[in-house]
Design a protein with these regions (language model features):
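Active-site region of PLP-dependent enzymes
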Residues: 24, 157-161
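PLP-dependent aminotransferase-like
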Residues: 67-146, 150-155
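Flexible, glycine/small-residue catalytic loop immediately N-terminal to the helix bearing the conserved Tyr-Lys
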Residues: 47, 135, 160
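Short gly/ser/thr-rich secondary-structure transition/capping motifs
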Residues: 57-60, 105-108, 161
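Short, solvent-exposed loop/turn segments at secondary-structure junctions
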Residues: 10, 60, 131-132, 157-158
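Conserved PLP-binding active-site segment in aminotransferase class I/II-type PLP enzymes
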Residues: 1-72, 145
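Active-site donor-binding loop signature of nucleotide-sugar glycosyltransferases
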Residues: 7, 102, 161
Length: 161
């Protein structure tokens, strides 16, 4: 007997098929189609943010964030307890991942171990929210401010955290 971890929300079949039909009729399958614009506005409201940019996946999102912050070399503190995209994004941007252990009760990066991993080469901290648990954002932000280090949160596991 299968045990399902999640049950996806699916719109009514006729509504779904109409949307797919509209996409095929317009012949706009990616990027600037009206569905993307609608998704961006919906997520902007849901997250309560002024700006929202949809990208194809979390790997690209992390790479864009690193580039936008001018982080193209140096060390990025993160956790090895994540999807490979977190680490590969750091490497693709010519940075070195520095791994910090996780907290045993929620599997998020242990903020008490971040500070001891900081070196003169540290450019950013990339904590990962895991399984619906958000990292200790306040403590991580305080550490980053104290050391003038940027923070990029990977919230792929905890959308909206």
């Amino acid at each position: 007997m299968p045990i399902y971890v999640t049950k996806p929300y699916l719109p009514p079949k006729d509504e779904y098929l109409q949307r797919v039909s509209d996409i095929f009729d317009r012949k706009i399958l990616t990027n600037q189609g009206p569905e993307v614009a609608e998704l961006e506005k919906t997520l902007q409201r849901f997250l309560g943010v002024k700006h929202f940019q949809y990208v194809t996946n979390g790997t690209v999102a992390i790479q864009i964030a690193l580039r936008a912050l001018g982080i193209t070399e140096g060390e990025v503190i993160t956790t090895p307890f994540s999807y490979v995209a977190t680490i590969s994004s750091i490497l693709w941007e010519h940075c070195k991942p520095v791994f910090v252990d996780i907290e045993p009760h929620n599997f998020t990066i242990d903020p008490n171990k971040i500070e001891e991993a900081i070196t003169p080469h540290t450019k950013a901290i990339l904590p990962v929210h895991v399984f619906g648990y958000a990292c200790d954002v306040d403590t991580i932000n305080e550490i980053a401010q104290r050391h003038n280090i940027k923070v990029i949160y990977d919230a792929a596991h905890t959308f909206g955290a």
